[in-house]
């Protein structure tokens, strides 16, 4: 198995497209592993529909996966594999992963590793100071706004309770904070 190693590079730096695998296991966590596959035209077309291109995906550590395996809380092993009709994408964090399966009728989201509490997406990419910050309902909205040069973050869901200290910190950094949640059910 090859280790996936994150290196902080400028978005314009060349990016390796080798297939890579990561395996994580700690005593207090369920083990998980995944295999990264290069973005192909079909995978990029899914994101392009939302105005999101590969540079934005790379900047936010979004990867396409060939497979993901873990075990349930009861200890039962499972593996899911990407297909042309059911791709698997991963939001890779430090010590955790959030799996997104946009076309899956069930299990659209899976989690591995030690998820931070509270979980947030996009916090590392926003500037220390700015005019407007959008808080959205999900990662795809963050990616789309960022691809169009807006600052955005999200928490795990639209129903997540955002800690007061985070709101206060963001208020010191941005002149305007706009909640931009979906109106669908």
Per-region residue spans from a language model:
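TOPRIM metal-binding catalytic domain and adjacent DNA-binding surface shared by DnaG-type primases
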Residues: 2-88, 92, 123-131
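Phosphate-handling DNA/RNA-contact segment within nucleic-acid enzymes
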Residues: 68-176
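Acidic, divalent-metal-binding catalytic cores of TOPRIM
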Residues: 39, 49, 157, 169-185
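Short linear motifs in intrinsically disordered/low-complexity regions
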Residues: 3, 41, 118, 142, ...
């Amino acid at each position: 198995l090859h280790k996936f190693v994150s290196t902080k590079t400028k978005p314009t730096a060349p990016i390796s497209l080798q297939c890579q695998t990561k395996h994580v296991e700690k005593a207090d966590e369920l083990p998980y592993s995944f295999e990264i596959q290069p973005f192909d035209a079909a995978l990029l077309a899914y994101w392009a529909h939302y105005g999101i291109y590969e540079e934005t995906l790379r900047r936010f550590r979004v990867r396409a996966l060939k497979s993901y395996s873990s075990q349930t809380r009861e200890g039962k092993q499972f593996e899911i594999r990407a297909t042309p009709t059911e791709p698997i994408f991963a939001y890779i964090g430090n010590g955790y992963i959030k799996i997104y399966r946009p076309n899956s009728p069930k299990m659209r989201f899976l989690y591995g590793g030690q998820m931070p509490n509270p979980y947030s997406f996009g916090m590392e990419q926003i500037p220390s100071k700015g005019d407007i910050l959008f808080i959205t309902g999900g990662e795809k909205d963050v990616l789309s706004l960022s691809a169009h040069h807006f600052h955005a973050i999200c928490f795990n869901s639209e129903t997540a309770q955002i800690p007061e200290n985070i709101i206060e910190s963001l208020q010191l950094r941005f002149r305007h904070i706009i909640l931009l949640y979906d109106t669908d059910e």
